Amino acid sequence: MQHEENEIVSKSELLVVTGMSGAGKSLVLQNLEDLGYFCVDNLPPILLPKFVELMEQGNPSLRKVAIAIDLRGQEFFKSLVKEVDLLRSQNRVIVDVMFVEASEAKLISRYKETRRAHPLNDNGQRSLIDAIEEERNSLTEIRSIANYVIDTTVLKPKELRAQINHLFNRNDIETFSISVTSFGFKHGIQQDADLVFDVRFLPNPFYVEALRPLTGVDDEVYQYVMKWQETAIFYDKLLDLLKFMIPGYKKEGKTQLVIAIGCTGGQHRSVALAKRLAEDLNESYDYNVYVHHRDAHIESGVENEKS
């Protein structure tokens, strides 16, 4: 029995995601990508065997693959059940099927909100209700062979994420990460930041000639920035605030929190504080914590640091 389990574990996993248009397949795919799946949207079923051949070549990034297939490719979709049955019978990879659905009323509501055309009604010749009914009837067979059926009628996005995480994060992989970035306001704000802190009120090493060409990574600059009382008070408050906020962000289903610390040029003060913050957060949590000094190299000439 142990031998059989090892054989199963060694196989790559293929998850086919299909279901009703507007039920949330794209969101499911995003959540699976966060769990380490290699995701492909709208692959014609006839290409599934070719994709499995790629998976069998041993590429580590293709150990877990999720492929969304739906009625957008109507002429190809009819072969989906046949292709899935064939792959399952060959037993080359683990093949699962997820079917995502929602009630007619909820689907109608979502289409009205997005103002998008249903894939079976792109010419506007039929009612939305008729298009939904035809699609549901067309998907009866593929639904019958699904391992997982998820009804998103009453699910909020974070609840759907939690359900996907429960089903497919089998190894309890920690998917939450924290990225701490230093930047200079004169070079533009960090666009992807969730939280931005302005430290231009702190004493500036730029005006100390010996420190000017260095960065906050250098010990001389780091010690200069940290020696001031206002820096110590600010940093203690910042760390307390973040330790209060971070669990809440994770609970809400975020997979990455980007914290940006900015000073004038992004070379001295923000770098020193980002460096310390990343170190302290790394000690406090089991999450992956990264530090990135975006602008430190621009005026100092040092290489941009990512860790």
From Swiss-Prot:
Write out the function statement from the record: Displays ATPase and GTPase activities.
Give the record's family classification.
Belongs to the RapZ-like family.
For this UniProt entry, the molecular function terms from Gene Ontology, in alphabetical order, are: ATP binding; GTP binding
Binding positions for GTP per the UniProt entry: 70-73
Residues binding ATP are 19-26
Provide the alphabetized UniProt keywords. ATP-binding, GTP-binding, Nucleotide-binding
Q: Which organism is it from?
A: Staphylococcus carnosus (strain TM300)
Its protein name is Nucleotide-binding protein Sca_0414
- Source organism, top-level taxon: Bacteria
Keyword hit for Oxidoreductase: no
**UniProt xrefs under PANTHER family:** RNASE ADAPTER PROTEIN RAPZ
